[in-house]
Amino acid sequence: MKLPIPYQMAVSTVHLKLTDQSAKKDRYGRTIPSWEGDIAKCVVNMQTTYSGTNNDRQIVANGLVMMYAGYSDPIPALTKENLESKLTYKGQEYTVKSINRFDQPGHRRLILL
């Protein structure tokens, strides 16, 4: 069964500075992005997610970005090497901590950051 994509919710644009673990560094020790650009038509859910019990809680995520194949443009090829890349949304810069890929029948790919 092919699940519908919430096109009316995919109205956000994020700016991604894609780096990988083996990326070159400039003379100041900063990582040089291997790809940089805006990704249009994606769904952004800014919600703090915690993990833990009682007083031992830690922040797992501050938000979730969903990019849909065939709709979001462009979708860069993301791997686990791209962790620690920088993502800017509404002027605030965030660090990519996990990359999850969800395949769906009838779609090339669906990627969550």
Curated annotation (Swiss-Prot):
InterPro entries recorded: Minor_capsid_put (IPR019612)
Pfam family, one: Minor_capsid_1
Family: Belongs to the Lactobacillus delbrueckii bacteriophages ORF5 protein family.
Name by which UniProt lists this protein: Uncharacterized protein ORF5
Organism ancestry: Viruses
